[in-house]
Amino acid sequence: VVTMAGGQGTRLGHTGPKGTFKLDVYGKGKYLFEILIENLKEANKKYDTVIPWYIMTSKENNKETTDFLEKNNYFGYDRDHVTIFMQSELPLVDTEGKLLISKELKIKEASDGNGGTYSSLRASGCLADMKEKGIKWVFIGGVDNCLVKMVDPVLMGVAIDKQVTVACKSVVKANPKEKVGVFCKRNGKPNVIEYTEITDEMAESTDENGELLYGESHILCNLFSVGAIERMGANPL
């Protein structure tokens, strides 16, 4: 399991890393990391194993995330099966495509986002570690989805049955204006278009049955074969 946890909790009204945000769960405060760990521990018990967990942080929040998990003793998860790695960074540009320069006359950089996960897994040695452990399938999701089912044999079974190397879960959009990325085809290939990029006309388009043409939302629940991660990590996205 790979959890993308490089972001800050700004949009949640939280000053720290997203994973350190606390929710009210049945009257009890629980951190996002804590909830995910509980789900992993349940899967470990069900399948009589200990699932290797890879947490992707960023240069911005790596220390704070690591300190938080250490302080809380990884909420009881076996530390030997947790690997923390940092995602890469890319140069920042303005709206005209010009590089942004800091006061120290250095090129400003920021984390390269979800698309950099694959190359970061490769560069950090995590991909090699997965192969050494004999791992065949990897679930990749975001730290802020507390309802995610990180270990889903049905999703894996569908991928194997359909002979595909990538499988994604989707939820139908509540309405055309819902702020979620949606699945589409670009040049005949599966793709995701973000809500910030889709036009109103596209968002509101329907088929002959009145269903949204772009109604399958991308909820960041993705399953990859190790081979697929290796291929994508070797090619710039």
Where do the protein language model's features map onto the residues?
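Domain-scale recognition of functional cores that engage charged ligands
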Residues: 1-3, 10-237
